A protein has these predicted regions:
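Active-site His/acidic residue clusters
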Residues: 225-229, 437-494, 498, 575-590
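Low-complexity, glycine/alanine/valine/leucine- and proline-rich hydrophobic stretches
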Residues: 645-691
Length: 727
């Protein structure tokens, strides 16, 4: 059976026009107004105006008129595109966080034969990462080929210098500026502004300007999706339907406990065998004073939706589903109604945890529905719909694996691992579909499971880790999860083997396709956290208010009139500079330079008295770390931690604790936010890479060079010396 995207490579010259027509058809086919809600943690805004359907029809009609001319131009350009190429196809498979030492260990033990063969076929090298080695920073340097001073991403969060509050670093949202009010309803007349804060041009856009087609699947920091000659499915920082980076829901008959990080507990009542509650959706910006939209559901204990026995029946909307203890439902589509015919869809999965003695139900964060996305999550917009139609619903949330539900002990290791494997399986379908439709050009896909599973299961690798179960539970018995990370690497090796057979053949390939397997950084234990703000207090650089509350977040307990420096987020410290921060006291210039030098001298080499280990290897001035027009937005000081250490959980959200050092006993027990020299990634290649010390930011320029495209002057990366014959 044919489908609209089956021959992407063959019809590359006409693809943009076809996509406009397809998109118009999809919008007209959806029997609901084309409004939606968006917002990465900053509220929601109606995402399209009342004129969107008319405008889309006009664009589709225009595309049809221009189709013959565009086809002729692109077909001529397409024939020239590969005239200087050294390869016909480049495939880059990203395994986020693959650790070189573990890969080398498992290869030596014969457990990863495919990566072993790939390395021997071409090469294996460690891959230099960036400062700091955080995924949004690293992947931004990968896709732009520049240092953070030019792409403007330094952390997951930025500090708002006016309020000292954290903002999402990659995206800003501004609501529609024009609305019309009809009775109790308010409708937008223009679109909200969803602005990508990452600067720099993705290298695949440069390829597209030279006629090279690209498929980009779930590469971080590609939301909102940018136009390109090809297809893009966005990843990290795509919000959930409530505008957060992932908010789970936990329904229980138990009294509400302490505040949950990463989600919320909803207390429910059981009436006989029936529990009624509701899913909380986005804020209703259409109906005045309506609050959040809700989707009611009912759970009937002891009932089944079908003939197969179940523990309970879930009814939501017009559909019923079986619930079994410890098992996830499939993705369930949930409709939220704002009124006046405005609706928005999301998808989520339910898992029944317990029915006796207490009722407990876990719901994953409500993802944007890829079939009817409430905002664009792909380019073209129809691409996410195509994937959903072809393979079924799939996770769209940027950080899709619910690490906080495991951290908060609402789900167990098995339930979290099942999430990760399921999402990886979805990604594999998307990746192989892209490979089938990218016979010439570039195909890039990133798998996140390697990162998420190592974050949450590293504790099983080290018996002396504070979070190892035997150190928390005196009755602990050895668990299968002591091999979870090994099993992960073996599973990723199988993915590599399947990819090699698909693109290189059973032998060494014909040289026309080059395969790279890469990671953006390695991995390290996270045993001890450091409260940077407590260190600043103890060293006289920060003062607290006299009435400071011990559990205050977001630095609200700080006396800014007596504070010279502060920490927020994962990357480093900020100086409370006069004229930049709203309550700054440090004069720019000489006073600023002296203060930074003083803190660098005191904190570099900081030792942990409990372990005797060096916790901080070095502290760097941003003037040394970064070069470029956006350096001013970076943290003033970047902290390089030793293996085993990281910024404390509370420091990241501006909460100040009594001690500088503390044990990390959370399931999130591995990390990579340390000195970048200590945590390189991996580079496996089907072709020999002769360059010494390759870096992540060199891969974009290398791709351009392989396709015979000149490297832009602003790129900091350089093409690697790849041994390859003419394609």
């Amino acid at each position: 059976m044919r489908h609209p995207f089956h021959d992407l490579r063959r019809f590359a010259p006409v693809r943009p026009a076809l996509f406009l027509v397809i998109a118009a058809g999809l919008i007209l086919a959806l029997a609901q107004p084309a409004q939606a809600y968006i917002g990465p943690g900053a509220g929601f805004a109606l995402a399209s105006s009342l004129f969107v359907i008319v405008w889309t029809m006009f664009l589709a009609f225009l595309a049809i008129l221009l189709w013959p001319i565009r086809w002729l131009i692109r077909s001529i350009r397409g024939r020239r595109a590969f005239s200087r190429a050294k390869v016909r196809r480049l495939v880059i498979l990203g395994l986020d966080g693959m650790e070189p030492s573990l890969a080398e260990k498992f290869i030596a033990e014969g457990k990863m034969p495919n990566l072993d063969r790939l390395g021997k076929m071409g090469c294996y090298k460690k891959l230099g990462t960036v400062t700091p080695p955080l995924s949004p920073v690293a992947w931004s340097s990968f896709l732009t080929g520049v240092n953070p001073g030019k792409h403007n991403i330094y952390d997951f969060l930025n500090s708002d210098r006016r309020t000292y509050l954290p903002n999402l670093s990659s995206v800003s949202i501004h609501p529609p500026t024009k609305t019309i009010k009809l009775g109790k309803y308010t409708f937008p007349l223009n679109k909200p502004e969803i602005r990508l804060l990452r600067k720099g041009k993705p290298f695949w856009n440069t390829l597209g300007e030279h006629g090279i087609f690209t498929s980009v699947i779930r590469v971080p920091i590609t939301w909102p999706p940018e136009k390109c000659r090809g297809v893009v499915l966005s990843a990290m920082c795509v919000p959930d339907l409530r505008g957060t980076q992932g908010l789970f829901s936990f329904y229980s008959t138990r009294p509400a406990g302490p505040e949950r990080t990463g989600g919320e507990q909803i207390v429910v009542r059981r009436e006989g065998n029936i529990v009624r509650s509701e899913l909380v959706g986005p804020d209703n910006s259409v109906k005045e004073g309506a609050g959040a939209m809700k989707a009611p559901f009912t759970v009937e204990i002891g009932k089944s939706a079908g003939k197969a026995k179940a523990d309970a029946k879930l009814t939501i909307g017009d559909d019923a589903y079986d619930l079994r203890i410890g098992e996830y439902t499939p993705w369930i589509t949930v409709e939220f109604k704002a009124g006046a015919g405005v609706k928005v869809n999301g998808i989520c999965r339910f898992m029944l945890i317990s029915i006796e003695p207490e009722f407990e139900l876990y719901v994953m964060p409500i993802n944007l529905d890829p079939e009817k996305p409430a905002m664009p999550i792909s380019f073209p917009t129809a691409y996410s719909t195509y994937l959903a139609k072809r393979y079924g619903s799939y996770a769209t949330l940027g950080l899709a694996e619910d690490t906080w539900a495991l951290n908060e002990e609402l789900i167990d290791d098995d339930a979290f691992l099942e999430q990760c494997v399921s999402i990886d399986n979805e990604r594999e379908q998307q990746f192989f579909d892209a490979l089938d439709n990218t016979r010439r050009g570039l195909c890039v896909c990133v798998f996140d499971g390697t990162d998420r599973i190592q974050h949450m299961f590293w504790r099983y690798l080290e018996e002396n880790h504070p979070a190892h179960p035997k150190n928390l539970d005196p009755d602990y018995q050895p668990s299968k999860h002591e091999k979870t990370i090994e099993d992960l690497y073996v599973r990723m090796d199988k993915l590599v083997g399947d990819t090699m057979r698909k693109v290189l053949g059973e032998q060494n390939g014909d040289g026309e396709t080059m395969l790279m397997v890469i990671s953006d950084h390695g991995f390290s234990p996270f045993r001890r956290g450091i409260d940077l703000n407590r260190w600043l207090i103890e060293n006289g650089y920060m003062k607290l208010k006299a009435d400071a509350k011990p559990d205050a977040k977001y630095l609200t307990s700080v006396d800014w009139s007596q504070t010279k420096a502060y920490a927020l987020g994962l990357a480093g410290m900020f100086i409370n500079q006069k004229g930049r921060e709203s309550q700054g006291i440090v004069e720019p210039g000489e006073e600023m330079r002296k203060l930074k030098a003083e803190i660098i001298a005191k904190m570099s080499g900081l030792k942990d008295a409990k372990t005797g280990e060096v916790a901080v290897t070095r502290v760097q001035d941003k003037e040394v770390c970064y070069k470029g027009p956006f350096r001013d937005t970076a943290p003033d000081l970047v902290i390089g931690y030793n293996r085993g250490y990281r910024v404390g959980w509370d420091t990241a959200i501006g909460k100040i604790t009594p001690e500088v050092f503390h044990d990390n006993t959370k399931a999130w027990s591995g990390d990579h936010c340390i000195d970048p020299e200590l945590i390189p990634g991996v580079l496996f290649s089907s072709h020999k890479v002769l360059s010494d010390s390759p870096r992540l930011m060199d891969l974009g320029p290398t791709a351009l060079d392989l396709f015979g495209v000149g490297v832009p002057e602003n790129m900091d990366g350089v093409p690697l010396n790849v041994e390859v014959g003419a394609a």
